[in-house]
Amino acid sequence: MSADANIKTIMSVYEAFGRGDVAAILDAVTDDVDWAAEAAGAAAPWYGVRHGKDGVAAFFAEFGSTMEVEEFTPVSIAANDTDVLSVVRFRAQSRATGKTAAMDLHHYFAFRDGKIAYYRGTEDTAQTRATLQT
């Protein structure tokens, strides 16, 4: 796939996330996708490595049951024929504590046959931990 096609796929995934359309996100990943929000420790239920579409669905279910997104704005995207890197301005409120986290997220996607085969996301884990703690 071309860099432009890969960016288009990521933007459609981001738009699906904004709508809460996990099925559309799952359509964009390979059956054996390797998906992870990288973090030391388990401060948030969505942290850790997931495999396959069921793992990605669990990631979004855990995230959605924990956080209410207030802002998710891609601010920079770079791509080539196999990879996409993005920076996303993010703000969300913990459903349990009412505390808000605001940060930039960093996403790396690797493509295979036009679909996302690998994802790694990083965030301010200390801020996430503080937001989720009661």
Predicted regions and their residues:
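A beta-strand edge to alpha-helix "cap/lid" segment located at domain peripheries
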Residues: M1-A5, A61-T134
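Hydrophobic alpha-helical core bundles mediating ligand binding, dimerization, or RNAP-core interactions
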Residues: I10, Y14-F17, V29, A37, ...
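A solvent-exposed, acidic/Ser-Thr-rich amphipathic alpha-helical stretch
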Residues: A24, T30-T82
